[in-house]
Amino acid sequence: MIQYPRYRQHRFSSFQVIIAGFAAVDLVGALLLMLPIAAQQRCITPFHEALFTSTSALCVTGLVVQDTGSYWSAFGQGVILLLIQIGGLGVITVGAAFALLSGRKISLKQRSTMQEATAAPQMGGIVRLTGFILRITALFELAGAALLLPTFCADYGLRGIWYALFHSISAFCNAGFDLLGTEGAKFVSLTRYAGDPLLTTVIAALIVFGGLGFLTWEDICTYRLDFHRYRMQSKVILVTTAFLLVLPTLYFYCFEFTAGSARQRILLSMFQSVTPRTAGFNTADLAAMGSTSQALMVVLMLLGGSPGSTAGGMKTTTFAVLLANMWATFRRREDAEFFGRRIDGSAVKNAATIAGMYLTLFFLGAFVIAAAEQLPMSVCLYETASAVATVGLTLGITPQLGILSQGVLIALMFLGRVGGLTLIYAAFGSSPAHSRLPQEKIAIG
């Protein structure tokens, strides 16, 4: 009797499923955008441009090689908006929502994947959390669209309804895509509305709300203003977010936007402190800003939003944990602390790993683009920070980049959206090693 070898069935980890899901949706989006019906001129869009746009939308970045408003048709804009919504919620969350709506039960493996995708602290209650994410997203996006409706309808008539919905979803998902460009004025973002307090405030609020994270909103909805009952993570996110909003606003007001009325300066300063984390809209000419302001925006872009949110970047908690660990080292304390709680040592190591990974990708991508395009390093650093942190702000060079440089930005956007730890665990596994080697000291600093 012939015995055939038995092959061990390979089981994909939750992290590999997340990456595969993003890649599959990205490819489908690119193929749809290549169709002639997706372009206003009814032409076939080159694959690399379609893939760039699909990746930028799915990874809620906002970098574009074609002006969204003047190049893409209603079908193409619809595909882009769908990709933005899927990317903002997360591919796994959207898949789980469809499974729940169809009446199917969520398996233990699927719950584990959903936990990793939403940055939930435990697997229990993950289905309930998914429902909360869908409800809070619909609430903010519809409310934002209703508030934007008067402005856009006054300028664009009935087309303003589509504009209001598109920009509301794009803002809450921290995508930064806009439809305001024309054949005569492309890539203008929100500059024509720089002095409109309603539109800029609504867009800025949606960006901040989307970047706080769904677990933070669960605490806010559950405990209202009782800050002491929030999770430590939510407290850290809210305090760090406030810090990263107020200080840059003051800087821009005092040193960058020094002309115009006080109201105009406040609106410009506030919006430019919000949008680098990590939306991609702009109400000012970014290329005309001072080098110090541009450097500050690069830092804000890399820091990004909060975990479990629609935003990208290293995340506010990563920044806060590194600061807390540095403060503990200054005080010669063994553990970093927040709000009377000790931070787990693995969180500190993860924060350092994520920061190191983002900075490596940031600098490496800039070197490749600078060498390939013969551009100043400072400009390339701005673009790669925008890509890896999934922001979408640009100094205007992205549409002129060659295929190699666009490929670098595509890779950075994808890696930046799936997350540093997700990528590491998908490649090397997430099971901790049980054996330990002998220890030896090494000099640091």
Spans of features found by a protein language model:
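Membrane-proximal intracellular helices of multi-pass ion channels
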Residues: 1-445
